[in-house]
């Protein structure tokens, strides 16, 4: 079973890299608009991917727990769309970024799911994509760099809180979790 999971993950990662390359090509050639058929949705879900293919809020795929986590994440009320600004921050990414509270809830939901698919979704969103989230917190100082992001932060409590970007990683190290 472990070998099968590893093979599926390897296949998915290859597909993901190919899709990202295709998206980069499309963007570079003025083909930024997504068509419904351009959506990439995890197998067994209707909400886990870029957009959704659900017929309504109650429509979930066979991986119901995983899909419910993705649906709730998609419905986060505090977000900054690509190219938009809010809370003094501008989202320069080509996708929507969310308040860290929504991402943290998403991480915990996926982590607590017994479904195998939840691990692949969690790994992809929190490790492969290398996205960021935002929250109102004291300024952070990165005291230890990891492979792709900061692995340890310290809060500068002498400064007032402000909205700022945080790396979303598999460790999900947010200020309230720091020592």
Swiss-Prot record:
Protein EC: 3.1.1.4
Positions contributing to Ca(2+) binding: 47, 49, 51, 74
InterPro entries documented for this protein: PLipase_A2_dom, PLipase_A2_dom_sf, PLipase_A2_His_AS
Keyword flag Cell membrane: no
Note describing how the cofactor binds: Binds 1 Ca(2+) ion.
Catalytic function, reaction form: a 1,2-diacyl-sn-glycero-3-phosphocholine + H2O = a 1-acyl-sn-glycero-3-phosphocholine + a fatty acid + H(+)
Cofactor: Ca(2+)
PROSITE patterns for this protein: PA2_HIS (PS00118)
A Gene Ontology biological process term: lipid catabolic process
One Gene Ontology molecular-function label: toxin activity
Active site location: 73, 103
Domain of life: Eukaryota
Subcellular location: Secreted
Keyword Amino-acid biosynthesis (UniProt): no
Residues spanning the signal sequence: 1-21
Gene3D superfamilies for the chain: Phospholipase A2 domain
Family membership noted in the UniProt record: Belongs to the phospholipase A2 family. Group III subfamily.
Function summary: May potentiate Xylotoxin(1)-Xa1a DRG activation and cell lysis, since the orthologous A.mellifera PA2 potentiates Xylotoxin(1)-Xa1a DRG activation and cell lysis. In vivo, intraplantar injection in mice may potentiate spontaneous pain behaviors and paw swelling caused by Xylotoxin(1)-Xa1a, since the orthologous A.mellifera PA2 shows this effect. PLA2 catalyzes the calcium-dependent hydrolysis of the 2-acyl groups in 3-sn-phosphoglycerides.
Protein name: Phospholipase A2
Source organism of this protein record: Xylocopa aruana (Great carpenter bee)
């Amino acid at each position: 079973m472990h070998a099968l999971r590893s093979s599926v993950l390897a296949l998915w990662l290859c597909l993901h890299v190919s899709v990202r390359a295709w998206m980069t090509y499309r963007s570079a050639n003025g083909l930024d608009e997504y068509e419904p058929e351009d959506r990439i949705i995890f197998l067994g879900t209707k909400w886990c991917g870029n957009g959704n293919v659900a017929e309504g809020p109650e429509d979930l795929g066979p991986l119901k727990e995983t899909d419910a986590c993705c649906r709730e994440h998609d419905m986060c009320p505090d977000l900054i769309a690509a190219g938009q600004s809010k809370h003094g921050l501008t989202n320069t990414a080509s996708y929507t970024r969310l308040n860290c509270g929504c991402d943290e809830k998403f991480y915990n939901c996926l982590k607590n799911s017994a479904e195998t698919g939840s691990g692949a979704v969690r790994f992809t969103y929190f490790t492969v994509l290398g996205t960021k989230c935002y929250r109102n917190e004291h300024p952070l100082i990165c005291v230890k760099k990891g492979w792709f992001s900061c692995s340890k932060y310290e809060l500068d409590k002498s400064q007032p809180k402000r909205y700022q970007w945080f790396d979303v990683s598999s460790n999900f190290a947010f200020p309230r979790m720091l020592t």
